[in-house]
């Protein structure tokens, strides 16, 4: 099979793609990985010892030709595309190559142009299965004219063992001069408009009025970095000095372990892998009630949901948690239980493997009698060691 990624840059889709590649059962499948561009995600996969081919071709028709040749040359039976361009290029190439099974995961809640929506709708009849991470994304995709597709809702999952490892000393607080006992808010996300960091920055003056010792770390990189830093710098002291931009980090599990409250102030979100990671680390979450987030968080149990683009509501929720260590602990334990029950990486991969086998049998590429033995759940499979996956 081929796992096809649209872009080798950073984001939640690449995080899900990486987890899937690391956990797929190599005794059942010959797995290949290919990205339609190079970037930090490709570099990370290679550092983890995975072979990743790259077709770095900006022209779509040329990319289709190269991918078609790759599919034929490597006798690919199943193509699983991740992200928009991979779905478009992958579907066209798979049809040309006669690939038995064509699937895609719709990772993004992005609002598509009319042209993009039309292109995806036109390709939907050749897709054997579409996977979505949440019911909200399912509704969105159906509304875009793809309702005739065969869908499976499979939530993103996180590697629980990775977040069970003892805290390593990433020295985040010492690195940035953050006092050890100060409540620390943290947002781990691409610095893009849809992630809503600006609303959390705007909330910081009110947060410090209600919880004067609070600090905020903003982890990630992206197109809004300069604008967000300028916004933070325009705030009065001591507020401005309490907002720290860390850039891209290679120790996301350790960073998550050092924060006290995880915040995701997105204005749209497919699901929110970073909040799953925080919950796996037993951290309470404040997040916008958008997209798939309410399907993850139960307000008042394992986190606090707030309206999107609302600095006042963000401030109130953050103050409530910053001022109550006991509440943070209770919500953190509840969040861990939620992830264990519904959002583990092994469960995600198991469900996807079941779909692979079902579709391969349907296409005649796998004998029906072989499918049951190819799907098995192992707590710590051989060859799937717990790895510290660097952040995107």
Regions found by a protein language model. Give the residues of each.
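Short hydrophobic beta-strand element within catalytic cores of glycosyltransferases
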Residues: 34-35, 284-287, 297
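Carbohydrate-associated surface elements
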Residues: 136, 157
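Conserved acidic donor-binding segment of nucleotide-sugar-dependent glycosyltransferases
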Residues: 299-300, 304-311, 320-325
């Amino acid at each position: 099979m081929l796992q096809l990624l649209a872009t080798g840059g950073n984001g939640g889709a690449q995080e899900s793609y990486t987890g899937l590649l690391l956990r797929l059962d190599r005794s059942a499948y010959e797995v290949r990985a290919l990205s339609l561009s190079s970037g930090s995600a490709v570099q990370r996969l290679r550092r983890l010892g995975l072979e990743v081919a790259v077709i770095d071709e900006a022209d779509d028709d040329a990319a289709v030709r190269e991918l078609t040749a790759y599919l034929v040359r490597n006798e690919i039976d199943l193509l699983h595309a991740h992200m928009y361009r991979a779905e478009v290029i992958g579907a066209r190439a798979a049809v040309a190559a006669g690939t038995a099974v064509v699937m895609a995961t719709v990772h993004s809640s992005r609002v598509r142009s009319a042209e993009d929506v039309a292109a995806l709708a036109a390709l939907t009849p050749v897709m054997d299965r579409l996977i979505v991470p949440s019911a909200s994304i399912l509704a969105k995709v159906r509304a875009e004219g793809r309702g005739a597709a065969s869908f499976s809702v499979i939530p993103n999952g996180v590697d629980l063992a990775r977040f069970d490892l003892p805290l390593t000393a990433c020295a985040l607080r010492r690195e940035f001069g953050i006092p050890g006992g100060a409540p620390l808010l943290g947002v781990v996300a691409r610095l893009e408009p849809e992630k809503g960091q600006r609303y959390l920055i705007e909330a910081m003056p009110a947060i410090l009025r209600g919880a004067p010792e609070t600090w905020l770390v903003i982890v990630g990189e992206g197109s809004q970095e300069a604008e967000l830093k300028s916004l933070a710098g325009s705030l009065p002291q001591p507020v401005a000095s309490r907002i720290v931009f860390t850039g891209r980090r290679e120790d996301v599990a350790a960073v998550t372990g050092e924060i006290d409250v995880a915040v995701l102030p997105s204005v749209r979100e497919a699901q929110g892998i970073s909040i799953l990671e925080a919950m796996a680390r037993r951290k309470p979450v404040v997040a916008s009630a958008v997209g798939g987030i309410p399907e993850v968080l139960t307000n008042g149990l394992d986190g606090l949901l707030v309206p999107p683009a609302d600095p006042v509501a963000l401030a109130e929720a953050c103050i409530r948690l910053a001022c109550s260590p006991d509440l943070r602990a209770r919500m953190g334990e509840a969040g861990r239980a939620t992830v264990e029950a519904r959002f583990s990486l092994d469960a995600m991969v198991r469900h996807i493997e079941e779909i692979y086998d079902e579709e391969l049998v349907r296409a005649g590429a796998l004998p029906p009698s072989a499918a049951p033995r190819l799907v098995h759940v192992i707590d710590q499979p051989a060859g799937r060691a717990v790895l510290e996956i660097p952040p995107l």
